[in-house]
C-alpha cells in the first residue's frame, strides 16, 4: 500500500502557472492625445495584444473633474518591447449622467450622423440637445437638421485629431448650442457617443518603432 501511494504521488502532474510567465505591457495613447500611459495589460505573446481595447475616463486623461462622465476607448495597434501603441476608437457617456440631465417639461432631441474628416476618418457621432421648454415637432425637426449639418461641416473642415478634441472638450457642442439657440431656447448639448468606423491616414510618432502592427482599416465597436 505504501508503494502504491508513493507511486501515485510521483506520477501526479503539477499545473503550470501561466500567469507568472506573462509579461506586462504599458499602453500608450496616440501622440495626438499626449502619448501618455493609460494602463497596463499582461500577455504571453505580444501579438495577442493587437486589437485589445483599453478604457479610460476623460477626467483621468485630462485631469478635468467635470469630464468624469465621459469614457474613452483606445485599441492596441502595435507593440515594441514592453510598450503598446493604440488608436482612439470612440467614446461614450455614462447612462446615469444622461438620465440626470433629462427633466420634465423639456424636449430631448437626438441626432445620429456618419461623417468623414478632412484626413479620411469616418465616424458615427451621436448628439443630444435638451431644450429649456417643451418643443413642438416642427421645432425638433429644424433643430435636428441644424445639428446634423453642423456636425458634418465641422468634420469635413477638420482633421481627425482636431475633430475628436472638439467632440470631447466642448467645441462641437458649443457650436451646436450657439447656432440652435437662435432657433429655440436650449438648456444643454451633449456629444454623448462616437465610434470610429474607418481609419484614415495619420502620422504618429510611436513610443518605439513598432515590432508588431495591426491593420488600420477597421475599428472595434465600443459598447453601448
Swiss-Prot record:
A GO term from the CC aspect: ribosome
GO biological process: translation
Organism: Methanococcus maripaludis (strain C7 / ATCC BAA-1331)
Family membership: Belongs to the eukaryotic ribosomal protein eS1 family.
GO molecular function: structural constituent of ribosome
Entry keyword set: Ribonucleoprotein, Ribosomal protein
Native organism taxonomy: Archaea, Methanobacteriati, Methanobacteriota, Methanomada group, Methanococci
Name of the featured protein: Small ribosomal subunit protein eS1
Pfam family name, one: Ribosomal_S3Ae
PANTHER family documented for this protein: 40S RIBOSOMAL PROTEIN S3A
Amino acid at each position: 500500500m505504501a508503494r502504491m501511494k508513493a507511486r501515485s504521488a510521483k506520477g501526479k502532474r503539477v499545473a503550470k502557472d501561466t500567469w507568472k510567465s506573462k509579461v506586462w505591457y504599458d499602453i500608450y495613447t496616440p501622440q495626438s492625445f499626449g502619448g501618455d500611459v493609460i494602463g497596463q495589460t499582461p500577455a504571453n505573446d505580444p501579438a495577442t495584444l493587437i486589437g485589445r481595447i483599453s478604457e479610460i475616463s476623460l477626467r483621468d486623461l485630462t485631469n478635468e473633474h467635470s469630464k468624469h462622465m465621459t469614457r474613452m476607448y483606445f485599441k492596441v495597434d502595435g507593440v515594441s518591447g514592453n510598450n503598446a501603441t493604440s488608436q482612439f476608437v470612440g467614446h461614450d457617456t455614462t447612462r446615469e449622467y444622461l438620465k440626470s440631465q433629462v427633466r420634465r417639461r423639456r424636449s430631448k432631441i437626438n441626432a445620429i450622423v456618419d461623417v468623414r474628416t478632412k484626413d479620411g476618418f469616418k465616424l458615427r457621432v451621436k448628439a443630444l440637445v435638451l431644450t429649456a421648454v417643451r418643443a413642438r415637432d416642427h421645432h425638433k425637426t429644424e433643430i435636428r437638421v441644424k445639428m446634423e449639418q453642423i456636425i458634418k461641416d465641422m468634420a469635413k473642415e477638420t482633421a481627425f485629431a482636431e475633430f475628436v478634441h472638439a467632440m470631447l472638450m466642448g467645441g462641437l457642442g458649443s457650436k451646436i448650442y450657439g447656432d440652435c439657440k437662435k432657433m429655440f431656447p436650449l438648456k444643454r448639448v451633449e456629444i454623448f457617443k462616437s465610434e470610429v468606423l474607418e481609419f484614415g491616414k495619420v502620422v504618429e510618432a510611436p513610443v518605439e518603432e513598432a515590432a508588431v502592427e495591426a491593420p488600420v482599416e477597421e475599428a472595434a465597436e465600443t459598447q453601448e
